[in-house]
């Protein structure tokens, strides 16, 4: 039957039986894959040559690898060609010429077979006994799980005990408040330490007039810097530091030798509230303190629009409660510590030193009035100077042809 052809292999056939046999051949399947990939087919001779080359490579891979060792030079090679090149090399010839030989023989090659790599995946029959694996019973599995859970529990308990020990060590950590935070220089008194830190490092305490516990404040700041490696100004906003030197270099480079206090951040201010006492500054327009003290006859009394005083009278005693505004909640929550006379003397001396050094402190009423008068005088002087400047900004010697 004429016209029987294969478009993939470019072959013509005499009958259908020959064509069907061709369709079952590997050569036709290979050309079909090439046709699907958009690549032209190959001839039968080229396909057979490729198949024979692949078979030779497979046989070589199946053969056991050999190791060729030169007894004179003590060198090993995986192929015979590399071993022959070594025998013709200059180093080998020099050793042979120098007379280094074994039992009078110059060229001795030790050829041995290398061990094959162990193949983990082997051909296993479906019905072989190696497929079957013994499985532990439910009781053994439960016992293993219980032992694992107990071991994990013991590990967690030991870890928690170590954490408790670390917390105990942190509580026992003591610090000398008379030691400088930046250079570890010791001083005899708190006052000399504060003056040193301000003079050499630019550190000062804000609102020192209301400070009630200077020793506690310096101890707390020292623990933050020397134990927790934390910047006094950045606090937790900055990346954590690994050592004390890193914290000190950061504070010196960024000029952070100061407290982040009084900038309007309630969280930062609440951290240092317990060391301050602002009760003396709570005054109204008439100069009276907002906090009410004393007994009153009325059961409920509104005081100054900021507090509500409630009194309860009994036969022997009289109790009173004060309800304040939310604006002063942060001050009501204070728990002031008992202050000693020594701390008051230190605060007074430090405030006087700060004033002598030119640092800003809380101004008095007279100073505020003077500042207002100075500002008004400076404003009036500026207006007068501008008027005089406008009038004098005229060219008086004009030429004759200018009428104005």
From Swiss-Prot:
Family: Belongs to the REI1 family.
Pfam families named among the record's database cross-references: zf-C2H2_2, zf-met
InterPro entries registered for this protein in UniProt: Matrin/U1-like-C_Znf_C2H2, ZN622/Rei1/Reh1_Znf-C2H2, Znf622/Rei1/Reh1, Znf_C2H2_sf, Znf_C2H2_type
Zinc-finger ranges (C2H2-type): 4-28, 68-92, 178-201, 229-256
Subcellular location: Cytoplasm
Function: Pre-60S-associated factor involved in the cytoplasmic maturation of the 60S subunit. Involved in the dissociation and recycling of other late pre-60S factors before newly synthesized large ribosomal subunits enter translation. Can complement the growth defect of a yeast mutant lacking REI1. Required for leaf growth under cold temperature conditions.
Amino acid composition bias (Acidic residues), ranges on this chain: 125-147, 160-169
One annotated Gene Ontology cellular component of this protein: cytoplasm
Phenotype upon loss of function: No visible phenotype under normal growth conditions. When grown at 10 degrees Celsius, the double mutant seedlings reil1-1 and reil2-1 show growth arrest at two cotyledon stage and die.
Major localization class: cytoplasm
Biological process, per Gene Ontology: ribosomal large subunit biogenesis
Molecular functions per Gene Ontology: nucleic acid binding; zinc ion binding
Keywords: Cytoplasm, Metal-binding, Repeat, Ribosome biogenesis, Zinc, Zinc-finger
PANTHER family: CYTOPLASMIC 60S SUBUNIT BIOGENESIS FACTOR ZNF622 (PTHR13182:SF8), ZINC FINGER PROTEIN 622 (PTHR13182)
Classification via SUPFAM superfamilies: beta-beta-alpha zinc fingers
Protein name: Cytoplasmic 60S subunit biogenesis factor REI1 homolog 1
Disulfide bonds: none
Region (Disordered): 119-169
Assembly notes: Can form homodimer. Interacts with RLP24, RPL24A, RPL24B, EBP1 and JJJ1.
